[in-house]
């Protein structure tokens, strides 16, 4: 093995002690001398693993309540020493080589995420010695192994066992990259935390304790290379946030089917996030990032049949998301009726897996069950910059709706208004959604004119033979003119939900009253671009 380096001395100092005892035992069995600190040293000693405390090794005690443990020339000289070049200096200063460093860092992210975390708590969980050792070992990867992730313990041990206690340069280099990624992410988290406490120099609007740091740092890890991007001439890859464990397309497990494409991932995200809005059994069918059919049902099969009925033409080649365990009967209805790119559900039953397995190209994903929506950020790339905002988790309750017309919505209309409003949140602006009895009747998406979105929703319903009469309508933003209300009335809409806020609200309300319609304002907009 070219550039092999034997491991004779290792320094182990970890906050997350997962697997460290077994790793230390295996290193000891291969004749490696072990150095360690604090809790790690105690864990090893308590379990009968011979270990030398770093303070005994350096001849200098830990000081300042443990703030200074490993910051010593015997430690860093041993890590940074260039084999074949620095031996005279090492001998003169009684420094021995350290061939392997296993370190993970104080749990800063977990600490600051805790309710009631103080600045002092955060400061005490900023690791100093750990990152210093990690960077030193990674810099000297020509001679030293650095391990920052417990999942790599077995990899290192296997290579040592196969090569007489030595590791290859390729392995050391790969682990060094992981180490620099680890420290970069760690420093980024700290910078983000402190960056929210000071005003950005470029804004007169900013204030202390902003949720947006003046310098934004994040780290995403490549999950997979994609065949191509949005179009075949664009290359692409899928990166994920390892700090997120929320049920999502990023954390989902693919059970079968072809590899996910760029567009599959984007559309699956849109479908899944929409279906999460509903408590009753629900199905969302998405095409080109827009819901083309959404419905509630007594069960998943009922919900799917009703969602499909909205727009069977657009559902062809679409993405289907559910908020319940996918059963065999529903899976059979899908694969027997239509061509589908992706099916995603929190859980997929064995019966459903067996059914979908007959269609080997269908991508079947299981994302796990979600509980409540978690706070997060949305990003939009612009040339030379990045727009960052809160994830749109705003939603009104029935009690918060403001009735602005003479006629008050019926109980049935109110239920449909709430359903329709949730769907509109996921339709590209300008968005108009018609719905009746927990089912979309028509969807008008992405038009520059709101009235044309309303017309398209009506056309869609007519094309599929769906009765608009008595349906409700949701608009993601206010109506600037009465023409949208007139178009809705002509189509048979009985009730409207919209944000309100136009300078012509009175004119719009008067139009609704003229048509005998009920209308409610949400005082909340749901633009989606």
UniProtKB/Swiss-Prot annotation:
Q: Which domain of life is it from?
A: Bacteria
By its UniProt entry, which InterPro entries does this protein fall under? AICAR_Tfase_dup_dom_sf, Cytidine_deaminase-like, MGS-like_dom, MGS-like_dom_sf, PurH-like
Which SMART domains does the protein's record reference?
A: AICARFT_IMPCHas, MGS
- What Enzyme Commission number(s) apply to this enzyme? 2.1.2.3, 3.5.4.10
Gene Ontology terms for molecular function: IMP cyclohydrolase activity; phosphoribosylaminoimidazolecarboxamide formyltransferase activity
Q: Which GO terms describe its cellular component?
A: cytosol
GO biological-process terms attached to the record:
'de novo' IMP biosynthetic process
Which residues belong to any copy of the MGS-like domain? 1-148
Reaction(s) catalysed by this chain, per the record, are:
(6R)-10-formyltetrahydrofolate + 5-amino-1-(5-phospho-beta-D-ribosyl)imidazole-4-carboxamide = 5-formamido-1-(5-phospho-D-ribosyl)imidazole-4-carboxamide + (6S)-5,6,7,8-tetrahydrofolate; IMP + H2O = 5-formamido-1-(5-phospho-D-ribosyl)imidazole-4-carboxamide
Q: In which pathway does it act?
A: Purine metabolism; IMP biosynthesis via de novo pathway; 5-formamido-1-(5-phospho-D-ribosyl)imidazole-4-carboxamide from 5-amino-1-(5-phospho-D-ribosyl)imidazole-4-carboxamide (10-formyl THF route): step 1/1; Purine metabolism; IMP biosynthesis via de novo pathway; IMP from 5-formamido-1-(5-phospho-D-ribosyl)imidazole-4-carboxamide: step 1/1
| Keyword terms, alphabetized | Hydrolase, Multifunctional enzyme, Purine biosynthesis, Transferase
Q: Which HAMAP family match?
A: PurH (MF_00139)
Domain comment quoted from the record: The IMP cyclohydrolase activity resides in the N-terminal region.
Membership in a protein family: Belongs to the PurH family.
- By its UniProt entry, which NCBIfam families does this protein fall under? PRK00881.1 (NF002049), purH (TIGR00355)
Name of protein = Bifunctional purine biosynthesis protein PurH
Species this protein is from: Shewanella amazonensis (strain ATCC BAA-1098 / SB2B)
């Amino acid at each position: 093995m070219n550039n092999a380096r034997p491991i004779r001395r290792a320094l182990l100092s970890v906050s997350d002690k997962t697997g460290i005892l077994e790793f230390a035992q295996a290193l000891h069995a291969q004749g490696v001398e072990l150095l360690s600190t604090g809790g790690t040293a105690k864990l090893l000693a308590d379990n009968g693993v011979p270990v030398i405390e770093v303070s005994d090794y350096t001849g200098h005690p830990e000081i300042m309540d443990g703030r200074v443990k490993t910051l010593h020339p015997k430690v860093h000289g041993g890590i940074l020493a260039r084999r074949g070049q620095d031996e005279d200096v090492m001998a003169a200063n009684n420094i021995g080589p350290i061939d392997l460093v296993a370190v993970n860092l104080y749990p800063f992210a977990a600490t600051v995420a805790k309710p009631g975390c103080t600045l002092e708590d955060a400061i005490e969980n900023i690791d100093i010695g750990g990152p210093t050792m990690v960077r030193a070992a990674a810099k000297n990867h020509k001679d030293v192994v650095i391990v920052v992730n417990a999942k790599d313990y077995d990899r290192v041990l296997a290579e040592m066992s196969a090569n007489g206690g030595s590791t290859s340069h390729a392995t050391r280099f790969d682990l060094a990259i992981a180490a620099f990624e680890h420290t970069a992410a760690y420093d980024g988290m700290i910078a983000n935390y402190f960056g929210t406490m000071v005003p950005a120099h470029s804004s007169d609007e900013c204030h202390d304790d902003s949720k947006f740091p003046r310098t934004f740092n994040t780290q995403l890890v490549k999950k997979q290379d994609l065949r191509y991007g949005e179009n075949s001439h664009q290359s692409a890859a899928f990166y994920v946030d390892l700090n997120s464990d929320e049920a999502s397309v990023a954390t989902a497990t693919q059970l079968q089917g072809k590899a996910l494409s760029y567009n599959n991932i984007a559309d699956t995200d849109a479908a899944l996030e929409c279906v999460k809005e509903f408590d009753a059994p629900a199905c969302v069918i998405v095409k080109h990032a827009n819901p083309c059919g959404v419905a509630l049902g007594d069960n998943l099969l009922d919900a799917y049949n009703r969602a499909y009925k909205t727009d069977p033409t657009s559902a062809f080649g679409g993405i289907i998301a559910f908020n319940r365990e996918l059963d065999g009967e529903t899976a059979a209805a899908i694969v027997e009726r239509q061509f589908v790119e992706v099916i995603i559900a929190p859980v997929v039953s064995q019966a459903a897996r067996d059914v979908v397995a007959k269609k080997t190209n269908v991508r079947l994903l299981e994302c796990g069950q979600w509980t409540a929506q978690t706070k997060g950020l949305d990003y939009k790339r612009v040339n030379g910059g990045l727009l960052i905002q809160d994830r749109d988790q705003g939603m009104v309750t029935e009690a918060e709706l403001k009735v602005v017309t003479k006629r008050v919505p019926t109980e049935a209309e109110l239920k449909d208004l709430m359903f329709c409003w949730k769907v509109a949140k996921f339709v590209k602006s300008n968005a108009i959604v018609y719905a009746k009895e927990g089912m979309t009747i028509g969807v008008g998406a992405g038009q520059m004119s709101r009235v044309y979105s309303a017309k398209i929703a009506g056309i869609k319903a007519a094309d599929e033979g769906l009765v608009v009469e008595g349906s409700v309508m949701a608009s993601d933003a206010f109506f600037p003119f009465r023409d949208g209300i007139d178009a809705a009335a002509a189509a048979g809409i009985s009730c409207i939900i919209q944000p309100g806020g136009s300078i012509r609200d009175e004119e719009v309300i008067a139009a609704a009253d003229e048509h005998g319609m009920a209308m409610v304002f949400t005082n909340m907009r749901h633009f989606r671009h």
